[in-house]
């Protein structure tokens, strides 16, 4: 059986490491502060924001959420961001994506002060990532690296294949792997013979947003498989096919009306991989944990205590 890379365990380790740093900041003057901007009432985004705010509360980080309506204009949202940039007690600003179509997302993300950009999306911080300079790293890619390192997975000299080229996951995780001396290939929808490329990977990262697309045929025996996907499958027939009619999984489907399935075939990965991240409970918990890491680090830099 392959080894499971347990994101919940690593998350708890990181939270334990953050607590004394947060206490030191509070003793120095004030705790770290995080502001989350959530536009409109997207149910999935609301869940993510609630989880972030709860984690802040658990750790002793000051947090607040700003919830403008989904009719907001780019200029109005820019004014909110600029106001948060100016507030001394706010160390981190997160603008929850996606934004409504009338809002210029790039302008909003560029308006966040690079020093308070705890998502790692500002061009200045992306440039620092490329140059391997200290700066906030995108949370999900940073979490993936923590899972690999704390899980004892060798990176240097390994062949890594990243399936997906998004600015949020694919590109930054490829760069982080490169900085750790892996040989990295990025694949996408136009990549020919994807299956054979994936089969060469010692570390395979799937971040494409398609449920169970990466089957066992894509996986090199013994490879480490990182599944970034979070796909809610509401088609019972499809869920049954993916889980090979597992009675336990189908009972869960009937209870909830859907199943959360990653980008990797959950049965095929068990048959082929040497280690893998489950969905849920793999990469997901680390995304919020690394947001907390970035917020605390920002507070330390701004307080001059790091």
From Swiss-Prot:
It catalyses: (6R)-5,10-methylene-5,6,7,8-tetrahydrofolate + NADP(+) = (6R)-5,10-methenyltetrahydrofolate + NADPH; (6R)-5,10-methenyltetrahydrofolate + H2O = (6R)-10-formyltetrahydrofolate + H(+). It holds the Pfam family THF_DHG_CYH. Pathway: One-carbon metabolism; tetrahydrofolate interconversion. Its EC number is 1.5.1.5, 3.5.4.9. GO terms for cellular component: cytosol. Keywords: Amino-acid biosynthesis, Histidine biosynthesis, Hydrolase, Methionine biosynthesis, Multifunctional enzyme, NADP, One-carbon metabolism, Oxidoreductase, Purine biosynthesis. NADP(+) binds at residues 164-166, 189, 230. One of its GO terms (molecular function) is methenyltetrahydrofolate cyclohydrolase activity. GO terms for biological process: L-histidine biosynthetic process; methionine biosynthetic process; purine nucleotide biosynthetic process; tetrahydrofolate interconversion. HAMAP family: THF_DHG_CYH. Catalyzes the oxidation of 5,10-methylenetetrahydrofolate to 5,10-methenyltetrahydrofolate and then the hydrolysis of 5,10-methenyltetrahydrofolate to 10-formyltetrahydrofolate. PANTHER family: C-1-TETRAHYDROFOLATE SYNTHASE, CYTOPLASMIC, C-1-TETRAHYDROFOLATE SYNTHASE, CYTOPLASMIC-RELATED. Belongs to the tetrahydrofolate dehydrogenase/cyclohydrolase family. Homodimer. This is Bifunctional protein FolD. It comes from Solibacter usitatus (strain Ellin6076). The gene is folD.
């Amino acid at each position: 059986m392959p080894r499971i890379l347990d994101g919940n365990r690593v998350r708890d380790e990181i939270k334990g490491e953050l607590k004394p740093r947060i206490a030191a900041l509070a003793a120095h003057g004030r705790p770290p502060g995080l502001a989350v901007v959530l536009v409109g009432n997207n149910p999935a985004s609301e869940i993510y924001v609630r989880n972030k705010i709860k984690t802040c509360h658990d750790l002793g980080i000051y947090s607040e959420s700003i919830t403008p309506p989904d009719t907001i204009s780019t200029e109005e949202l820019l004014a909110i961001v600029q106001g948060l940039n100016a507030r001394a007690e706010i160390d981190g600003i997160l603008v929850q994506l996606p934004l409504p179509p009338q809002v210029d997302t790039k302008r909003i993300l560029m308006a966040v002060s690079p020093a308070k950009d705890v998502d790692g999306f500002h061009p200045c911080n992306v440039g620092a990532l490329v140059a391997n300079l200290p700066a906030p790293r995108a949370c999900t890619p940073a979490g993936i690296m923590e899972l690999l390192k704390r899980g004892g997975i060798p990176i240097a000299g390994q062949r890594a294949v990243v399936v997906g080229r998004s600015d949020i996951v694919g590109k930054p995780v490829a760069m982080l792997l490169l900085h750790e001396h892996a040989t990295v290939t990025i694949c996408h929808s136009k990549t020919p013979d994807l299956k054979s490329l994936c089969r060469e990977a010692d570390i395979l990262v799937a971040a494409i947003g398609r449920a169970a697309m990466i089957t066992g045929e894509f996986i090199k025996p013994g490879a480490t498989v990182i599944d970034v996907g979070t796909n809610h499958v509401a088609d019972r027939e499809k869920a049954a096919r993916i889980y090979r009619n597992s009675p336990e999984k189908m009972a869960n489907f009937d209870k909830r009306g859907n199943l959360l399935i990653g980008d990797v075939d959950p049965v095929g990965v068990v048959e082929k991989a040497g280690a893998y991240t489950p969905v849920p409970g793999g990469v997901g918990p680390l995304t919020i944990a690394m947001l907390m890491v970035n917020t605390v680090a920002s507070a330390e830099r701004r307080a001059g205590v790091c």
